Amino acid sequence: MFVTGESGMAYHNPFIVNGKIRFPANTNLVRHVEKWAKVRGDKLAYRFLDFSTERDGVARDILWSDFSARNRAVGARLQQVTQPGDRVAILCPQNLDYLISFFGALYSGRIAVPLFDPAEPGHVGRLHAVLDDCAPSTILTTTDSAEGVRKFIRARSAKERPRVIAVDAVPTEVAATWQQPEANEETVAYLQYTSGSTRIPSGVQITHLNLPTNVVQVLNALEGQEGDRGVSWLPFFHDMGLITVLLASVLGHSFTFMTPAAFVRRPGRWIRELARKPGETGGTFSAAPNFAFEHAAVRGVPRDDEPPLDLSNVKGILNGSEPVSPASMRKFFEAFAPYGLKQTAVKPSYGLAEATLFVSTTPMDEVPTVIHVDRDELNNQRFVEVAADAPNAVAQVSAGKVGVSEWAVIVDADTASELPDGQIGEIWLHGNNLGTGYWGKEEESAQTFKNILKSRISESRAEGAPDDALWVRTGDYGTYFKDHLYIAGRIKDLVIIDGRNHYPQDLECTAQESTKALRVGYVAAFSVPANQLPQTVFDDSHAGLKFDPEDTSEQLVIVGERAAGTHKLDHQPIVDDIRAAIAVGHGVTVRDVLLVSAGTIPRTSSGKIGRRACRAAYLDGSLRSGVGSPTVFATSD
């Protein structure tokens, strides 16, 4: 049974024994929620801040006892109409019913598929692709959304059309028929679909062992204490949003959330909720992608006529999901340090869906670590620290240290051999938080999830992992430096020009810093074959390139969204500044700089720049014509 200490005492985690996570047989989140329903039944479990009708929001609360009852009712209904192994898709708006839907699927012993209301803008194609891939027998939604969901699936044949259940219409009395599911540690709990931008999304199989393991890893990294509470606006269909909101089910205290749109429209809502300290609660924790820190710093600072703000109780905000910018963190600290925000509060982190979510983060007593390395050495797969003002200096943000009972090694993927600290290779992972494969994709699963590390170095980062352990290939470049993990970039996004490697985020950063005419965080760098460049490039004397139908050499393209108020500016000086900065900083010629309007660059469902989708739209001409349909991150209220 899970135990917490007295109020104010350190969070005691009985599942960590001798540095490894150990669970009793058949431990799962269902058992945790049922325990809290018994020992904290009259206490707040979840609060949804609903800003759809009131500017200041309406708090919609559910207690642990009621949460358990609703979960059992939905779980029982699913047990009545589905079979073990069936997929249950969640097409709910982000509210309490979404959480009840997800837990209801876990309570039923079926496989949850956290998705989103089809009314959300920008996601229709992805939603159809995921439903085709997982073939759910049932869809959970709400009474208000049910009609839209039925219209959305109407085009499917009757045989392929899932049953639609409105969870808020399921009587609580049905809970009396619920039976504890016969799920074990290896049973798949849910499918976490990746945020791929060009290929069909893959559903990572997360088991009933993977899920609590990763939740415990996050809580341990955050040094949770009795009374700590969570705050989030992240979408539940994204791995970071889902795992963050599930922390409450193990910690046993309350969690407050809002919709992504509520944050995007008024980021001060998130900041003020982080500062709120009701009753005897302890510290506050949260998570957000990098852009949120910049957005909050610009638009979330309280006005003079608003109540005072005290952020001294904010313990940790995981910063992940996209590359972490030192400038964004600096702006966030400068904006909120006057309100008591600790320098240790923001935690640059690393994670991915294949690991359930969490891999590493900055230790709680440390400020974010930013070092500078030589660009040429970096492009040659080596980490060599230099002074910040050195000519070739590139800032690198530490992703901290790997979580408890988890292993991350840097590998030469060609030889499956571990590399020493300071050398860049592919990050391979092992641990009980790693998913078991991709749903219905045996070959792809084997390539990603079933790799053997053929050789280890002395003082190996794999120490403690079995010799025959299976390792997950992340597709990310990284290295260890001074005992911290650093992420260099995605292998598939690497730009190779004239035989030299260039990390796209490095090129994007240089372009961003060369001009104020680009939206912060909305720049994409990629390469295309010379003979596939559009004719307009060859007509431009600045490109310095003549068309040759046999020239397949890779050429650099930069696409950037114009910042607000810059649409009337002459584009040529902006383009010239970008070209010059990259030529000087990287020694490479930019053959095309395309400036587009806000909202044009494709983004993945987790908000990252979709470089491959952007490249595809560039090649087919839709990006230049402005008729592309990028994925939109924010969801509606």
Swiss-Prot record:
Pathway: Lipid metabolism; mycolic acid biosynthesis. Keywords: ATP-binding, Fatty acid metabolism, Ligase, Lipid metabolism, Nucleotide-binding. GO terms for cellular component: plasma membrane. Involved in the biosynthesis of mycolic acids. Catalyzes the activation of long-chain fatty acids as acyl-adenylates (acyl-AMP), which are then transferred to the phosphopantetheine arm of the polyketide synthase Pks13 for further chain extension. GO terms for molecular function: adenylyltransferase activity; ATP binding; long-chain fatty acid [acyl-carrier-protein] ligase activity. It holds the Pfam family AMP-binding. One of its GO terms (biological process) is fatty acid biosynthetic process. The gene is fadD32. It catalyses: a long-chain fatty acid + holo-[ACP] + ATP = a long-chain fatty acyl-[ACP] + AMP + diphosphate. This is Long-chain-fatty-acid--AMP ligase FadD32. Its EC number is 6.2.1.20.
